[in-house]
């Protein structure tokens, strides 16, 4: 079966798991990550959401409203709440999947502490529109959510540099991975020092248990997502037997992982250091895969293709269809797993429905209902394209 995702890891990463934990690996990873993102400083965290919560603390933002997209990963508002602030949700633009910045500007009040644009699925935020907002509100911190996008660019401008800081995720579904983990980057030296100070009293060192768990987790995940094996794994996943490993949110709860305050370990950093050398090749391959899909699926009825931007990094290739469940079922019958990441509109979730930042976001609701993610790791592309041509044309003619 063709899995919906597969981390780009090889022998260098697996060999890193067999080496003794090396003191200084985390700072080395931070320096390498900052250089890759063309920023002055980077700070590693156990999760991107932990980094966001600590960043808001370092900025002195508390008891404020934080503007964020309604259609994004739910861990973002979770981190906002854990930081002592309140998320205010803004609808999305169907044409580029990202937060409607004009609508976001209308939400700015005296209580607004920051705004978090997200380059969802690797599609860059419209930096021209954002520049106008920043000019009209020069004191408002902009935090770029680059968990999906990393170094995506808008008209040649790197998104991650257009704000006070940027937040990245590093689990195995991301463009590059440190098994688990997150990173915050900035060009502001004073903020970097304060962020590290906050981390010092908020985050405990990684335990030996965490280090060993990560040594085992990465090869296990790589094997589970190996196509000849994945059919059996997918059966267990659909039965709910793997929920503790694959389900990252609870519809009714605002929570964080149990180890959200246990720092990144040296084993994770060692894997991350090796991943940095792969980044350019990973992005080149994903752009090639996206171009393949864009060409092969063009003109098919009942499918809306994602927006095309030259600077996109394509963490996901996300189409829109009206009959998503039928498409997913038919694909599974053909040995293809399609994804539906961000299958929720956050304000509609029970955990947020009655909070002060609730807003009705119809576009986000529609996108959450229609979005389908195609496998981007590069395997089975011809089979996937053939499936779409045969299935969509057949459905359209009946």
Regions found by a protein language model. Give the residues of each.
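Conserved active-site segment immediately N-terminal to the catalytic lysine
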Residues: 144-178, 193
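Short beta-strand-to-turn element immediately C-terminal to the catalytic PLP-Schiff-base lysine
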Residues: 168-169, 183-188, 219
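Conserved PLP-binding active-site segment in aminotransferase class I/II-type PLP enzymes
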Residues: 1-62, 83, 108, 255, ...
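PLP-dependent aminotransferase class I/II
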Residues: 27-32, 36-43, 115-118, 127, ...
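PLP-dependent aminotransferase-like
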Residues: 57-153
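Structural preference for beta-strand elements that scaffold enzyme active sites
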Residues: 141-143, 165, 371-373
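A short alpha/beta connector and helix-capping loop motif
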Residues: 98-104, 156-166, 383, 387-393
């Amino acid at each position: 079966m063709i899995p919906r995702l597969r981390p780009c890891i090889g022998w260098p990463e697996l060999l890193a798991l067999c080496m003794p934990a090396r003191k200084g690996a985390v700072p080395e990873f931070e320096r390498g990550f900052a250089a890759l993102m063309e920023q002055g400083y980077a700070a590693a965290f156990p999760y991107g959401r932990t980094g966001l919560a600590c960043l808001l603390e370092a900025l002195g933002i508390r008891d404020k409203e934080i503007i964020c997209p309604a259609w994004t990963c739910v861990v973002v508002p979770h981190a906002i709440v854990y930081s002592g602030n309140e998320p205010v949700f803004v609808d999305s633009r169907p044409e580029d999947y990202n937060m409607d910045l004009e609508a976001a500007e209308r939400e700015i009040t005296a209580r607004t502490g920051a705004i978090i644009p997200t380059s969802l699925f690797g599609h860059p935020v419209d930096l021209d529109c954002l520049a106008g907002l920043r000019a009209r509100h020069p004191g408002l911190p902009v935090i770029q959510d680059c968990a999906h996008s990393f170094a995506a660019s808008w008209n040649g401008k790197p998104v991650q540099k257009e704000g006070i800081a940027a937040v990245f995720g590093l689990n195995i579904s991301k463009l590059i991975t440190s098994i688990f983990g997150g990173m915050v980057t900035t060009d502001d030296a004073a903020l970097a020092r304060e962020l590290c100070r906050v981390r010092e009293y908020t985050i405990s060192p990684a335990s030996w248990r965490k280090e060993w768990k990560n040594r085992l987790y990465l090869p296990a995940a790589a094997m589970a997502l190996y196509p000849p094996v994945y059919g059996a794994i997918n059966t267990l996943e659909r039965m709910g037997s793997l929920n503790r490993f694959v389900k990252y949110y609870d519809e009714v709860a605002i929570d964080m992982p149990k180890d959200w305050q246990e720092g990144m370990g040296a084993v994770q950093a060692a894997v991350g250091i090796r991943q940095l050398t792969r980044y350019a090749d990973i992005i080149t391959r994903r752009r090639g895969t996206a171009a393949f899909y864009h060409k092969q699926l063009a003109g098919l009825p009942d499918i809306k293709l994602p927006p095309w931007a030259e600077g996109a990094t394509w963490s996901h290739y996300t189409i829109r269809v009206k009959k998503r469940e039928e498409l997913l079922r038919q694909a599974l019958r053909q040995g293809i797993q399609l994804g539906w990441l961000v299958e929720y509109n956050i304000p509609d979730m029970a955990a947020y429905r009655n909070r002060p930042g609730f807003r009705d976001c119809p576009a986000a609701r529609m996108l959450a209902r229609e979005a389908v993610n195609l496998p981007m790791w590069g395997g089975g592309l011809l089979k996937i394209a053939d499936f779409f041509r045969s299935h969509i044309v057949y459905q359209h003619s009946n």
